[in-house]
């Protein structure tokens, strides 16, 4: 399975947001990053069979921007395990297996996305950092598990924006 582990695009400064943080949308830069990431996937010939996202607004908008650039219809699949602080790596891997796909993008938050990436690669938590809109491609077997992933590549938004 190819997993594309993505931290949501730029959503501005959370300290400037006065309403419920779950409703914080992407900034203009974040909207550009999400679309550019989808365009970069297209240029590289990456075909996503599924996109799974945290239900929070900024992650949903990131996922939708990627999907729109790729011409994928419908909405992303939402997982409560991708909400901030809800990450359970093995449970998330089980959810991904249930999708019965070979290529899936996962859009979530810091520190959960880097920690899931580390779990897949067999590293201690917090050994890797994903900046906003960064993406890591991890290749796993049919059932992603701890330490069984291989890092294909990791890029920051400067690569595709």
Which functions belong to the PLM regions below?
Residues 2-86, 113, 126-132:
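Active-site-proximal alpha-helix that buttresses catalytic centers in soluble enzyme cores
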Residues 3, 101-108:
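Generic beta-sheet signal
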Residues 44-46, 97-102:
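Glycine-rich phosphate-binding loop signature in dinucleotide/nucleotide-binding domains
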Residues 83-100:
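Short phosphate-binding loop-to-helix
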Residues 110-119:
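Extended, charge-rich low-complexity interaction segments
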Residues 124-150, 156-160:
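Domain-level recognition of soluble alpha/beta enzyme cores
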């Amino acid at each position: 399975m190819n997993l594309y582990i993505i931290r949501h695009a730029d959503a501005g400064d959370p300290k400037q947001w006065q309403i419920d943080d779950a409703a914080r949308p992407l900034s203009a830069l974040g909207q550009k990053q999400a679309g550019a990431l989808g365009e970069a996937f297209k240029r590289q010939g990456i075909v996503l069979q599924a996109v799974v996202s945290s239900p929070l607004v900024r992650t949903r908008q990131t996922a939708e921007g990627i999907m729109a650039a790729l011409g994928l219809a419908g909405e992303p699949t939402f997982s409560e395990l991708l909400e901030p602080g809800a990450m359970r790596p093995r449970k998330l891997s089980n959810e991904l297996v249930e999708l019965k796909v070979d290529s899936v993008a996962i859009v979530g938050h810091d520190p959960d996305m880097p920690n899931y990436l580390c779990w897949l690669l067999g590293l201690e938590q917090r050994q890797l950092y994903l900046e906003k809109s960064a993406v890591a491609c991890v290749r796993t077997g049919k059932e992603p598990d701890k330490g069984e992933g291989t890092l294909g590549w990791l890029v920051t938004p400067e690569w595709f924006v």
